[in-house]
Amino acid sequence: RIITGFYAGRTHSIIENRDCALGVTRNKEVLDRVIAHMEKFHIQPYDENTGKGLVRHVLIRYGFFTDEMMVCLIINGEKLPGEEALVKSLCQIPETVSVMVNVNKKRNNVILGEKVRLLWGQPYITDKIGEISYQISPLSFFQVNPYQTGRLYGKALEYAQLSGNETVWDLYCGIGTISLFLAQK
């Protein structure tokens, strides 16, 4: 049986759930379509204990300021059966601008592999923090709530009292959202 959900704390046991409180309402529709596709094409979910199965994860990225959505399936192989049918199904969701596959054939519990293949659309979505737009790929680290991130960065900018002559080091920065935000000053 195919389930979606979250890892229980400090385990690799999955707590079944399709409604992420941090996510957007479209997440459930995406997951329903992916599961229907897996069932139609007899695609097995990945089993971390055996290393068998194809679909490891479904990564959904959503641009809160642009309403752009990316769906990326992380797979334990090179090709997903029925890729064209999956693209057709996911593109019925109006916000979809990108459908991708990420290949992770390593027997580990790391989510993403290094190889990304675009099935349809753009290789990224765009979102904003403050007045700065960012192009976000499946491999990008980006905050899950850009509204609150913008407010938090605004406070940091206020407290930093920058004159514009400082050098900011954004260590472990993901895609550099903090330093780019502070560079406004």
List each model region and its residues.
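Accessory RNA-recognition modules of RNA-modification enzymes
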Residues: R1-K185
